[in-house]
């Protein structure tokens, strides 16, 4: 059965790969992007099934208008994939107020606006699936990525709550949590850099040396995972992507449990 998939940030990276994959299997795709000209050739290849919309996800009014335009074009939306976002590299001490506001406005509020816009339509349909791109960094952190992790931790909490709130309406909700992938995430469009303080220069060098050596996943390899998620009658709330992310996250939770257990007496005594 043909599905209508609304994808934000569909001009590059995961968003572009997933948009092309859904089109190739015959689905309808609404590609919401900041620069529609980036999808000009793809629009020529799929003139019927692809609907390209200009959208800055930080614009709440525009997000609601985009959902309405998608409904007018295809009659409804089966799946909303909130993929738009970017990273910010910088130690916590280095972050400016503008760094923080911009990151949260795009990564958190940008997702919130499209979710709020899509929910009335999905409730009326009594069906729908909201897929929120998070990250393994929404479950753990690394140095210099504290702000990005903060937005993803926020996304994790908001999306898990959303899943509980809308399940009675027939709406499914999933978080997709990729590890490191060979996308353009570290490029100028997807990774901003804060003003640097010299005491963190060595930490920066270690960060980039490790990033260059890490076994990055291939973005195209995620396509079947997205198909399985979208087509599942009972999709998981969380789906980790990549062989490096799973053991890292598993170890994180094991260490947290050990710490909580070691301090359990103190925790219980604090109840009063």
Kindly give the residue locations of the regions a language model identified.
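Substrate-binding pocket helix/loop in short-chain dehydrogenase/reductase
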Residues: 91-92, 99-101
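The beta1-alpha1 cofactor-binding region of Rossmann-like NAD(H)/NADP(H)-dependent oxidoreductases
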Residues: 55-65, 97
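Residue(s) in the substrate-gating loop at a strand-loop-helix junction
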Residues: 135
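A glycine-rich helix->loop->beta "capping" turn
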Residues: 69-82, 88
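Conserved glycine-rich cofactor-binding loop
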Residues: 11-12
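Active-site helix of classical SDR
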Residues: 115, 151
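SDR active-site lid
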Residues: 168-236
